[in-house]
C-alpha cells in the first residue's frame, strides 16, 4: 500500500512541515518515483474536491498548497499547483501547464476558433519520471465535486494519469508552461 495511515491528518502534517510531510504521510520508502507520483495523484483525487461553486461566483479559490489542502477544494489551477508542490517536495520535477480544454465552458469539438485561441481555461501537470515527461491531470481524474454547498464523493480515475499525447490532445491544448521544474 503506497498510502500510509499514521494518524496524522493531511492539513496538520502539511501545515506543520511546510509541504514536506509526503515522505512520511503518503509515501513509503521502497516506492519508485512513478509509484510515488501515482500515490500523490490518487491521494489528491480522493481527498480533494473540485469547487464547482467558485466557478459560478466571484470568490477566488485558494492557490497555495497549504490553503488548498486545508480547504479540501480547488479548481484546476489549485489541483495542478498542489500536485507540483507535492512532487517538488520529494525532488520530482513537475511543471504546471496552462492550456485550453474542451468541455470546460465550451462545446465539445475542436473548431477553427478553439484551435486558434490563446485563451486559457484549464491547468494540469507534466511530471518528469524515469527519464521522460508524463502528463497528469488530477482535475479530470477527480470525480469529487462541491456543488451547491454539497460535497459529492466520486471514484478516482486514471484516464489522465500518464496519458499518451495523442489521447490527451483530443481535448487539451498546451498554451504555457510554468518556468520552474
Question: Which residues does each predicted region cover?
Answer:
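Secondary-structure boundary elements
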Residues: 6-74, 84
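A structural boundary/capping signal
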Residues: 18, 22-35, 59-65, 82-89, ...
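Hydrophobic/aromatic-rich core segments of domains that either
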Residues: 78-168
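Generic serine detector
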Residues: 5, 46, 54-57, 71, ...
Amino acid at each position: 500500500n503506497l498510502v500510509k495511515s499514521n494518524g496524522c491528518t493531511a492539513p496538520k502534517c502539511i501545515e506543520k512541515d511546510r509541504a514536506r510531510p509526503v515522505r512520511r504521510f503518503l509515501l513509503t520508502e521502497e516506492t519508485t518515483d512513478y509509484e510515488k507520483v501515482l500515490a500523490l495523484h490518487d491521494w489528491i483525487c480522493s481527498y480533494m474536491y473540485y469547487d464547482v461553486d467558485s466557478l459560478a461566483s466571484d470568490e477566488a479559490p485558494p492557490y497555495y498548497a497549504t490553503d488548498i489542502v486545508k480547504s479540501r477544494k480547488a479548481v484546476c489551477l489549485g489541483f495542478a499547483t498542489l500536485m507540483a508542490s507535492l512532487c517538488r517536495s520529494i525532488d520530482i520535477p513537475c511543471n504546471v501547464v496552462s492550456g485550453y480544454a474542451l468541455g470546460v465552458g465550451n462545446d465539445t469539438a475542436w473548431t477553427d476558433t478553439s484551435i486558434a485561441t490563446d485563451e486559457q481555461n484549464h491547468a494540469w501537470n507534466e511530471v518528469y519520471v524515469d527519464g521522460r515527461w508524463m502528463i497528469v491531470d488530477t482535475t479530470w481524474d477527480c470525480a469529487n465535486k462541491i456543488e451547491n454547498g454539497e460535497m459529492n464523493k466520486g471514484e478516482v480515475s486514471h484516464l489522465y494519469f500518464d496519458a499518451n499525447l495523442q489521447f490527451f490532445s483530443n481535448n487539451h491544448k498546451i498554451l504555457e508552461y510554468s518556468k520552474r521544474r
